[in-house]
């Protein structure tokens, strides 16, 4: 049995602990740590319910701790096989450094590019595996895109698209908070890594808007930061790019969302990271935009995740196109409703932990998501979250449905 520490018991952190215990089939003992007792209390309710839903025994500890305190974090890390960091991106580098120092394998779901580069620097002196960006996007999307790209000799255009959306949109933004509002605003403000004309570069977020439809539903997609992960450099190393290749990641939303967010973040200047106070003492910056979203945009469990990869390139001398699409709705599992964004993000990082335990990922060093083949990912029970979420409960012998 492997001892795994999950730092952060927010909405998705709780789900990571629960899913690892549910689908790990007794392979893991989980310690879930957070400084908010309310989060731990909710986690206990979920895990006590899980005990009644699965046939195998589950072992866990819930620890109230200040995860911003380096000494407390090091104490929690002692004797652990792995740590999954579910904290805001500003905590990531410190946790990764401590984990590497103590010989604890490191995983996170961060989308922040600068933070990931700091993890890569730590990995230059790696004692363990350091595996950042393990969620949905970045994360699974790179695995899926690599699976499409490997079918081509050279790539003309590869577009990765992911959206976590409300099933029922009723406000002008056509958006509900289903993920970290701070993470969303960060993605909408930071530069976006792309390849244009065969050259790796950056473009501003909220640009490159395109419109498309699936199954009668209209969507838009636009550049956002972080989702492409390390895929561009991997495809360059694989010699699949040409002097005209275009590769990019875009976030999917309902039409009209991008324009309104540009109004808030750019025209109203709420995208500033460190704004100076006005004469009245008010500060108009990203923190205010995050607060506005959390105040006004209701949360929902009735969400849907859309994954769409399209690739045009050359195969055996012919120009072809291959598409990949998955649509995941919120699902009843283990006695409760799992929002799609929680399930897919948790499944992404849990799968990578499981594959490392099984020796199917590098034992040490910086590990890219696309180093995991899609077929290998889907061989874990966590792959069902993307392929057939309704079958997850049956796969682990669950008896429970949401009450």
Q: Model segments located where?
A:
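C-terminal catalytic/substrate-binding lobe primarily of soluble NAD(P)-dependent oxidoreductases
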Residues: 151-403
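Beta-loop-alpha module in the N-terminal Rossmann-like domain of NAD(P)-dependent dehydrogenases
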Residues: 71, 83-99, 113-114
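Helix N-cap at the beta1-alpha1 junction of Rossmann-like dinucleotide-binding domains, i.e.
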Residues: 35-39, 113
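Hydrophobic/small residue at the entry helix of a nucleotide-binding pocket
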Residues: 12
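Conserved Rossmann-fold cofactor-binding substructure of NAD(P)-dependent oxidoreductases
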Residues: 65-79
